Regions:
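Extracellular polysaccharide-recognition and catalytic grooves
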Residues: 2-189
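A contiguous, well-structured "functional interface" segment within a domain
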Residues: 25-59, 222-224, 233-294
Length: 451
């Protein structure tokens, strides 16, 4: 405007209203029809810079709204990053990678003494190193299309080799002057320094229905959200349809033979393994994050899903309903091969068998309490974003009618000698209708779930 260019004010205001209407609170915009990092590297980034450079002068009311939404980021979004600052592999366009931390850097625009700018910069610098220090990051001196290295399952049809440079949005932090608190604060670990070991911490975004969980024992962050049908079919892919996403365990793609990690797959009427794609939020109560889901090709195959984050993993209490027999599989997170072959073992504690895999960095263990017929170690090739070879623990069963599946999905650092980590539960009780459950944990806590 200052240069004499004409602006269609009515059209501009219409677009601004559409953007603001997508806001769901706690820093999250809805990238219709799904939540993902576009809330951060698009809505929040553009909203704050537009307000700063243009909106405050010409559209102050809209700028005020964008900046009010932007101010909510430090209260929630930093918790989505691991203790060491790593980001979670989640959502479309993940090849933009470190661009996810740009709004944390731009909180410097607020110059708010209550913001821990050392934590914001710690995350920003750590996400840069997360990728620049990975040996597979570059190919022909250009960042690969993937997460760490090239990884086709994570790529959308609109992406090309040049798409990766969206990650450069993080360097918009250089817009901040040298005397800005973002540049002058001492980097630190933020809230992680206050977290206690053997506890779990959850941040719930009530209107967005996003649950972020932090695990001090291994320094991991984790995310749960919902999905819905989209004409673009984004909801069909692993970027969105995992049960949860973890900073330490990037998602593994599904295999044609039923290989599955952190999701359910069902053999459909065509004889193909079909993952869950539609997750509808039900409630977050007494620590349980509850959703319902259904098979897209046959909505009569219906799931009630409940997850309770624990200090060293997840307790799942799920109910599956199907009018006819169906084969069902569900997996833990997968481990990439990092230090030689992945070690496999079976540990028996308190009458329960725990299948354990160990890649020299982490151990993952899965215990079936109820419902499952068997567990197995499943080897995969070229399904994991961080290694050609990987292993996952899968459980399987043939379900008809209504059936409850209770599963512990646990973890620890490799080298730990404490096998008690594999059984944090004393007992689980439920009524005849299997609609009410009481979980007694070994730390004395009691949790209740009611469907």
């Amino acid at each position: 405007l200052s240069q004499g260019y004409h602006t269609d004010k009515a059209y501009l205001e219409e677009l601004l209203q559409i953007l603001l209407a997508a806001y769901r609170g706690d820093g999250w915009y809805h990238d219709n029809p799904l939540f993902d990092y576009y809330s951060m590297w698009a809505f929040q980034m553009y909203g704050s810079l537009w307000s700063e450079k243009f909106g405050k002068k010409y559209y102050p009311d809209y700028a005020r709204q964008f900046m009010e939404h932007f101010r909510e980021i430090p209260e929630n979004y930093p918790y989505m990053f691991a203790r060491d600052g790593k980001m979670i592999m989640w959502g479309r366009s993940i090849t933009y990678r470190m661009g996810a931390s740009v709004p944390l850097a731009l909180t410097g625009l607020l110059e708010d003494p209550d913001i821990n700018y050392g934590w914001m910069r710690r995350i920003a610098s750590s996400t840069i190193l997360q990728f620049l220090q990975h040996p597979d990051f570059l190919e022909d001196r250009i960042p690969t299309l993937g997460f760490y290295g090239a990884f086709e399952p994570a790529i959308q049809g609109y992406s090309c080799r040049g798409s990766v440079f969206w990650m450069g949005k993080l360097f918009l932090a250089l817009y901040l002057p040298a005397n800005n608190p973002f540049w002058n604060a001492v980097e630190n670990e933020g809230a992680w320094t206050d977290f206690e070991k053997d506890r779990v911490y959850c941040k719930y975004a009530e209107d967005a229905h996003i649950l972020v969980t932090d695990y001090p024992n291994i320094g991991a962050s984790e995310l749960r959200s919902t999905t819905s049908h989209s004409s673009s079919n984004y909801h069909c892919v692993e970027n969105y349809n995992r049960l949860s996403y973890n900073s330490e365990f990037p998602w593994q793609a599904d295999g044609k033979n039923g290989e599955v990690a952190m999701s359910y797959v069902v053999k459909n009427k065509e004889g193909k393994w079909e993952p869950l794609r539609n997750y509808s939020f039900k409630k977050y109560e007494d620590g349980f994050y509850c959703r319902e889901a259904w098979l897209e090709s046959d909505e009569a195959v219906y799931f009630q899903l409940a997850e309770l984050p624990l200090p060293d993993g997840i307790l799942r209490i799920d109910k599956v309903s199907s009018p006819s027999p169906v084969e069902v599989r569900m997996g833990h997170y997968a481990l990439p091969e990092k230090q030689g072959k992945i070690r496999e073992s079976v540990i028996r504690l308190d009458g329960k068998e725990t299948y354990v895999i160990d890649n020299g960095v982490y151990r993952l263990g899965m215990t079936t309490w109820e419902g499952w017929k068997q567990m197995e170690f499943v080897h995969a090739e070229e399904l994991h974003p961080d290694s050609r070879n990987s292993v996952v623990i899968d459980a399987s069963d043939r379900c008809e009618g209504e059936k409850v599946y209770i599963t512990l999905q646990l973890w620890s650092k490799s080298g730990s000698k404490d096998d008690d980590v594999w059984n944090p539960v004393s007992k689980i009780c439920f009524d005849k209708s299997r609609k009410q459950f009481e979980v007694v944990l070994k730390d004395g806590n009691v949790k209740r779930l009611k469907w």
